[in-house]
From Swiss-Prot:
Residues 39-293 form the CoA carboxyltransferase C-terminal domain. One of its GO terms (cellular component) is acetyl-CoA carboxylase complex. Pathway: Lipid metabolism; malonyl-CoA biosynthesis; malonyl-CoA from acetyl-CoA: step 1/1. Pfam families: ACCA. The keyword Nucleotide-binding applies. Keywords: ATP-binding, Cytoplasm, Fatty acid biosynthesis, Fatty acid metabolism, Lipid biosynthesis, Lipid metabolism, Nucleotide-binding, Transferase. It is an enzyme of class 2 (transferase). This is Acetyl-coenzyme A carboxylase carboxyl transferase subunit alpha. Acetyl-CoA carboxylase is a heterohexamer composed of biotin carboxyl carrier protein (AccB), biotin carboxylase (AccC) and two subunits each of ACCase subunit alpha (AccA) and ACCase subunit beta (AccD).
Amino acid sequence: MNPNYLDFEQPIADLEAKIEELRMVGNDTDINITDEISRLKKKSISLTESIFSDLKSWDIARLARHPRRPYTQDYIDLIFEDFDELHGDRRYADDLSIIGGTARLDNTPVMIIGHQKGREVRDKVKRNFGMPRPEGYRKALRLMEMAERFKMPILTFIDTPGAYPGIGAEERGQSEAIAFNLAVMSRLKTPIISTVIGEGGSGGALAIGVCDQLNMLQYSTYAVISPEGCASILWKSAEYAAQAAEAMGVTADRLKELGVADHVIDEPLGGAHRNPEKMAETLKTSLAQGVAELSRLPLDELVSRRYERLTRYDGGR
């Protein structure tokens, strides 16, 4: 099976393989098969629309983790100008699973902070598979406080299976780093927009996700635990991950219904990885609109609304 396709996409993969075979035949002979290729392309689009119109929560959870899905660095390259990466937490180290720095969204200076996974094995290890350690969250906090000082909107990109659970991370205060971020972000006097671009895993995601506006890409997820983790606890087996994903309500549409997400941003047909440029263009429009709207609010009102938003997560208790 083509690794760029998930199992529920197998009929699409088979059809695309047939189209590619016909292209090769056309290149090697004088036979004109343009009409047949065009017919199969239309059939592929129709089939993709049919499959993606009825995705289950578990299908979406796997799409959110797709290895070709655009990461934070990809969106930085496609959306922003003059990105200047900033490093280190000024206490311990530079955690490369969190990237951040100043940039321009059109002509507006912004601070960008996001989780970063790796593509190849060596890069995955360097980025710690997108699982930040305490120094990553402290780096993020340093950049957020800098953004407040220079009156720059903060744009965060969430894409992590969760905070790193290693012994060293715990010894250096993983839970304290996350909790401190939540407290400080709740009162920062600058607009904050967070976008879940892949998987939003537990406190590791929330540590850069306290915001004035939460966007979720159409095939992203946000949850307190992975479906496999939930299934292992409740059903004693990760084999029940599909049932867990459905019960947890991890998808963008479900979270918008609950009032957790503000906007669900449509992805290109087949997911963001099928057309990263189009996805970036759509996301850029949403971010620019959000920054413009939030920047018009008085800062005290902005912070007050953010706090009210947080209290709604637990029913206002």
